[in-house]
């Protein structure tokens, strides 16, 4: 069994910080579960164009408000606590945070640890692994 404490994990290299977000990666590829699980905070006012070319992702809103726009059809979906959006076709999208948002994210294939978005809005398939348990 694996047991991790979010508050302890955010004090280790499991916490990855970028300019508009930070993410605590609680479950990663090295845990051999076939997916990764993160608690990600999107900062108020953030606008994040993304397209996960190598990963599928589901995102459940725990707190805050914003919207996600799918670029293929221009549809805008409100995001608030209790809403999940699923990127099941490597969808090109823009996430906008009206307030600070806390999201529970699941990736398949799992992230290795220190991924950040590249210029296209994607994560690489492999990145540096974290060292903390």
Curated annotation (Swiss-Prot):
Pathway: Amine and polyamine biosynthesis; ectoine biosynthesis; L-ectoine from L-aspartate 4-semialdehyde: step 3/3. It catalyses: (2S)-4-acetamido-2-aminobutanoate = L-ectoine + H2O. CDD domains: cupin_EctC. One of its GO terms (biological process) is ectoine biosynthetic process. Its EC number is 4.2.1.108. Keywords: Lyase. GO terms for molecular function: ectoine synthase activity. SUPFAM superfamilies: RmlC-like cupins. It comes from the Bacteria. It is an enzyme of class 4 (lyase). Belongs to the ectoine synthase family. PANTHER family: L-ECTOINE SYNTHASE (PTHR39289:SF1), PTHR39289. Catalyzes the circularization of gamma-N-acetyl-alpha,gamma-diaminobutyric acid (ADABA) to ectoine (1,4,5,6-tetrahydro-2-methyl-4-pyrimidine carboxylic acid), which is an excellent osmoprotectant. This is L-ectoine synthase. It comes from Nitrosococcus oceani (strain ATCC 19707 / BCRC 17464 / JCM 30415 / NCIMB 11848 / C-107).
